[in-house]
Amino acid sequence: VLGVHRDGAFTEYLTVPQQFVHKADGVSLDQAAMVEFLAIGAHAVRRSGVQAGQRVLVVGAGPIGMAAMIFAQLRGATVTALDGRQDRLDFCTRALGVAAGVALGDGDEAQLAARTAGDFFDVVFDATGNPQAMERGFRFVAHGGSYVLISVVAASITFSDPEFHKREMTLIGSRNATADDFDTVLQAMRAGHIPAALNT
């Protein structure tokens, strides 16, 4: 990724090898502008191995969190969003079709437990960029489930090792995206799977 793995992307013009350029045929310029952040969510979902019928929680309903919601749903998962902003939760349920939006605050953990008969979620994604939220997210992972940290923070995060082992969790870090993820996003756009309302 230019600007991540190799410096020199903050310039008006640059040359790159042809194989690294993705043709955005069949998508609008507005759609093409969304490909990068959608690819980050698609990459996280691919790394998680989300399967049809699984219960997914996405903590953080910003652009990358919404991308994870979209691609988890495309794999057949039932998605719940957790965020502190009601307007974002309303958008996720209305425009993205997620099963539920839960507002961060007193009683949120009880609401999440109620949605899963107390088992919590097969896969939890954190897209908050907040160390406290990242630490709290471990509580929402079902036995045998996975916790995917999309966010990167310049801080240490801690968790209870006995609880982590008791639940036999899998912890996954997800960073950026690959060429395959960009192709996945472009195919989803061409197939009409990315809601137009996302481009606001």
Describe the role of every protein-language-model region.
Residues 48, 90-170:
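Glycine-rich cofactor phosphate-binding loops and adjacent beta1-alpha1 units
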Residues 1-21:
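Glycine-rich phosphate/adenylate-binding loop and adjacent beta-alpha elements
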Residues 22, 80, 146-148, 172:
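Structural detector of well-ordered beta-strand residues that form the stable sheet scaffold
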Residues 85, 153, 177:
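Residues in the short beta-alpha loop(s) of Rossmann-like NAD(P)-binding domains
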Residues 172-175, 187-200:
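Glycine- and charged-residue-rich phosphate/anionic-cofactor binding loop of Rossmann-like
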Residues 27-106:
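Mid-domain Rossmann-like dinucleotide-binding core that forms the NAD(H)/NADP(H) cofactor-binding site
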Residues 13, 33, 57-61, 81-82, ...:
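Glycine- and other small-residue-rich loops at beta-strand/loop junctions that grip anionic moieties
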Residues 11, 53, 98, 120-121, ...:
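Local beta-strand N-terminus motif with an aromatic residue
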